[in-house]
A protein has these predicted regions:
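Catalytic alpha/beta core domains of metabolic enzymes, predominantly
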Residues: 75-182
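Glycine-rich, proline-tolerant flexible connector loops at the mouths of alpha/beta enzymes
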Residues: 1-19, 182-194
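Alpha-helix-loop-beta-strand connector modules within alpha/beta enzyme cores
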Residues: 13-38, 72-78, 128-140, 166, ...
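C-terminal alpha-helical cap/extension of soluble enzyme domains
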Residues: 152-218
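Short acidic active-site motifs
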Residues: 45-48, 67-68, 127
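Active-site mouth loops of central-metabolism enzymes
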Residues: 8-16, 35-39, 58-60, 117-118, ...
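Catalytic beta/alpha-barrel core
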Residues: 15-17, 33-42, 54-67, 78-89, ...
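Short beta-strand segments at enzyme active-site cores
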Residues: 1-2, 35-40, 140-142, 176-185
Length: 218
């Protein structure tokens, strides 16, 4: 996110300023020749954010917000909708239809686990297959899905040792891509330090995932 709007505590880090953050995303895209994506949280944001990034992401907690989905769709950018931790895969049909109603068919859905009690998430092994029945690409959020939310200290916990397992199992069940938050020193990350993948582990996971993908399509 260019702005971390969804934080547990009032004093949690939320960003470095909207314009500065968006300019950094734009510069990264140009310098590395990659496409960029960021969250939006309110319906007035997509039109501005679309000037800086290639794709727009709808956070899981906001995946039913009609005006936000319509505003994202109207930009014409790719829209990645994260599945709420409270929704079934089949219920994602409706957010997808909201974006598509704008004439924008470049829509993806993103699995990120389902709430299990108050302080845990689990990943349903059937979710990827069920989401693919919607006829849109399916992304697996491999890092937020290992969260341990609602900690008393107001900082979300997690188990990053499970990231590789989540990623490889998702690829084996048909995922089209990954969402992975990574950092060279996760403990010093401004957000989600307990679920960040250490950067030097990313290549190995992606190599294994691509081998699985090749085997599936052999």
């Amino acid at each position: 996110s260019y702005r971390k709007a969804n934080r547990s505590r009032l004093d949690s880090f939320t960003g470095i300023g909207d314009e500065k953050a968006l300019e950094i995303l734009q510069a990264v895209g140009k310098e590395l020749g990659v496409e960029t994506i960021t969250d939006v949280h309110e319906s007035h944001e997509p039109a501005t954010v679309a000037k800086y990034v290639d794709h727009i992401q709808i956070p899981a907690f906001l995946c039913r917000q009609t005006e936000l989905l319509l505003a994202a769709g109207e930009t014409g950018k790719g829209v990645n909708i994260k599945k709420g931790q409270f929704l079934s895969p089949e219920a994602m049909k409706f957010p997808v239809e909201k974006v598509q109603s704008t004439g924008n068919n470049n829509v993806w859905v993103c699995e990120r686990g389902v709430s299990f009690g108050y302080s845990d998430l689990i990943v349903d092994a059937t979710a990827i297959h069920r989401l693919k029945q919607l006829g849109v690409p399916v992304i697996m959020d491999c890092t937020h899905s290992v969260q341990k939310p609602n900690k008393t200290e107001g900082v979300t916990g997690g188990d990053p040792s499970l990231i590789e397992t989540i990623a490889l199992s998702a690829m084996a069940t048909g995922a089209d891509g990954f969402f992975i938050e990574t950092h060279p020193d996760p403990k010093s990350a401004k957000s989600d330090p307990h679920t960040m993948l250490q950067l030097d582990k990313l290549e190995g996971i992606l190599t294994k995932a691509m081998n699985i993908r090749k085997a599936l399509h052999a």
